[in-house]
């Protein structure tokens, strides 16, 4: 999971602007250079087993409110709208560029490597590969440029990378984490499904010969448990996954494809056919509960029934003692893991960002009623103060200024 790749740039611009990583990848043709599957194990090119350990680069290419300490303003779209209301679209675009340039850098990837990690999971928003408005850009999206950078940094650090479409077209979850409109429209929209397939085909075509990438996670945490037609949606899950696999296999037969369960990656009952592709592994998530084997027995039972690898793509936000105990449980049961997240404000991460001076004024605005133009005007604080606070955040998020959470890192048992 820590070998890298990041994604962004318009689909046309990417093929013209970023040949360097693609040219390197074209030189690698031997399928033996890639991670393979043997039963429930991942096998490295040298024949040894890979047990995934490390973290997620959450918030970087898919902003999430709570990592900024926002509450109501919790999705990428809501965050961007709030910033535009606060300081205008031009300054917001400047902020997003600086954010992407500084939140994750080569130094962060090397730091992650030094913790004993071997794999990084990279969550990204599908809009990074379209002309849609996202993080201050439209037609000039820089997704491929960002992923190319991470791939090179992971190569230098000897890490593997998992590409995770955290926010799919139409929304796959129906909550803030997929930046949707409150429903997983992906499962009912042919246009969204086509775009999802097209983006994965383009990503796979670019990286088809890149062994730093462990695999492609088609989308994150499908189908939240809030909907009265949940079982109907669950019944569509495997078919939507298969469409993505078919699109990828048109151009890439080298990489593993990761499939997550329904309802927070915890329900694997919708899966009826584990043999439709020979490079499939499954991924689960878990926050809270007992750190015991009994607590994840249904996941283990599914893994054993299909005899394919299972990996805990997200876990965290608990005490160091709980994390240490659960890591031991996962090691004993051959379930690799990447903790969520690597970096955010305050603790419960590898490194913490200290809120800059006057950030509380931005928090106040983010939580204030803004359903009318009058409410926006009345809540808006002093421009000079909040613009400085936003730029101070950029400085604060640099690794050199973050607080290393030593106990958290030690609890993961990677060294």
At which residue positions do the language-model features occur?
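Conserved Rossmann-like nucleotide-binding pocket used by diverse enzymes
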Residues: 17, 161-162, 311
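Low-complexity, flexible helical/coil segments
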Residues: 76-79, 86-95, 157-160, 199, ...
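Active-site mouth of glycoside hydrolases
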Residues: 30, 37-52, 56-256, 261-270
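Bacterial Sec-dependent N-terminal signal peptides
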Residues: 1-27
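Extended, alpha-helix-rich binding/interface surfaces that flank or overlap catalytic cores
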Residues: 329, 336-338, 343-415
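Extracellular glycoside hydrolase catalytic/binding regions
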Residues: 33-35, 194-344, 349-366
């Amino acid at each position: 999971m820590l070998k890298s790749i990041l994604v962004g740039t318009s689909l046309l611009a990417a093929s013209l602007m970023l040949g360097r990583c693609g040219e390197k990848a074209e030189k690698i043709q031997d399928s033996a250079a890639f991670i393979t599957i043997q039963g429930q194990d991942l096998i490295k090119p040298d024949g040894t087993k890979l047990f995934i350990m490390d973290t997620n680069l959450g918030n970087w290419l898919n902003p999430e409110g709570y990592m900024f300490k926002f509450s109501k303003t919790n999705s990428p779209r809501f965050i961007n709208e709030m910033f535009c209301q606060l300081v205008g679209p031009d300054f917001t675009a400047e902020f997003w560029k600086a954010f992407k340039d500084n939140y994750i850098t080569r130094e962060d990837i090397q730091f992650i490597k030094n913790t004993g990690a071997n794999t990084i999971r990279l969550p990204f928003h599908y809009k990074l590969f379209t002309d849609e408005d996202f993080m201050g850009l439209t037609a000039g999206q820089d997704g491929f440029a960002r992923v190319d950078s991470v791939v090179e940094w992971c190569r230098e650090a000897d890490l593997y990378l998992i590409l995770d479409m955290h926010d799919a077209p139409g929304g796959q979850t129906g909550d803030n984490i997929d930046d949707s409109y409150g429903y997983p429209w992906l499962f009912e929209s042919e246009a969204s499904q086509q775009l999802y397939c097209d983006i994965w085909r383009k990503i796979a075509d670019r990286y088809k010969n890149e062994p730093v990438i462990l695999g492609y996670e088609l989308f994150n945490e499908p189908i939240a448990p809030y909907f009265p037609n949940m079982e109907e949606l669950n019944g569509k899950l495997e078919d939507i996954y298969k469409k993505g696999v078919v699109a990828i296999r048109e151009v890439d037969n080298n990489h593993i494809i990761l499939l997550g369960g329904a309802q927070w990656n915890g329900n694997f009952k919708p899966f009826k056919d584990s043999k439709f592709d020979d490079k499939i592994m499954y991924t689960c998530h878990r926050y809270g509960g007992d750190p015991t084997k009994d607590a994840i027995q249904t996941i283990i039972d599914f893994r054993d029934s299909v005899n394919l690898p299972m990996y805990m793509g997200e876990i965290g936000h608990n005490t160091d003692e709980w994390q240490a105990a659960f890591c031991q449980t996962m090691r004993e049961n051959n379930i690799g893991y990447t903790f969520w997240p690597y970096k955010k404000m305050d603790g419960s991460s590898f490194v913490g960002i200290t809120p800059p001076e006057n950030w509380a004024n931005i928090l106040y605005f983010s939580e204030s009623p803004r359903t009318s133009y009058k409410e926006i005007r009345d809540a808006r604080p002093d421009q000079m103060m909040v613009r400085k606070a936003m730029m101070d955040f950029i400085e604060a998020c640099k690794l050199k200024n973050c607080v290393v959470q030593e106990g958290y890192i030690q609890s993961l048992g990677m060294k």
